[in-house]
Each structure stands twice: as structure tokens, then as C-alpha cells.
């Protein structure tokens, strides 16, 4: 039986071989970028046009990256790269959204809590402690997947919305807007 006569799934064709070749190429490119600190060099290069601030809204830290994260992340990578090529200095700092319902729902489900009274009975302080402990269970996966998308972002110096300094900066910003009667 010739290759053309085989069922499509068992044929050896260029797309099957190409995937393996592409995977090898991906690994080589990522290794080259890492060994030569290419991302870091973009941050160190001369920026005659000054700073360009790019606000990158962080993903929730409670799950694995999905298509929506990858798509949004690609868009969020293009703009800072473009501005860097135009001569701006653009910090690209990763962030983690650690607040709100996603983490609360996750902990409630894990602990079998269904109502506010259940949480109070369990103990709010203990509930919050469990939430903080579980927030970064997927961090390793994110740190592996995001660079594989080709995105250049500083994940080692990430900000976390649950950190006091971050929360205080949000309150400070809100106060500035309030005093200017913008909110």
C-alpha cells in the first residue's frame, strides 16, 4: 500500500513531520532567547523617546491558561514590542489577580462551603489563609506556557493584587481621581 492509499490518520505527510520540526524549532528559539537574554536586552536598550506605560491587566491566578489568555496575551505582547522598536522603554511586568470570586468559589467548593454562614462557621481568617495558600498553585504552569507563546514578560518580578503595596497604590490612585472630581 502506498502512502497515498493509507487512511489519512496513518499517512506520513509533511504536516505530521512538520509538527515535530516546528516543536524542535520552538525549543531552539526559546533556548536562544533565554541564553542570550534577548528580552532583558530589549529593556536595557537606549530609549530616546522615553517611557511608554502599558497597563497589562492580569489574569486570575486560579486556573490554567486557556485560549482567551493566549489570544489576549499575544495582543498584549505586540504593543510593547512595537513601542520598543519605535524607541520607547516599555516595562513588561507580569501580574496576578488574586482577588474576588474566582478564588473564593474555588475554596468554597474545595471545603464544601455553600453559604456566608458556612464560611463564618469555618472561620473567615482560616478561609482567607486557605485562599492565599491556593492562589499560586498554577503559577508553575503559567511560567512554562506563557514563554512558549513567544510572549516577553517579566514573570519573576510579578505584582500580586493581594499584596498590601499594590492595594495601597490602588487606593491612592482612586483618591487622586476623587480629589479631581473624576469619580
Predicted regions and their residues:
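N-terminal, positively charged nucleic-acid-binding surface of large information/translation enzymes
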Residues: 2-183
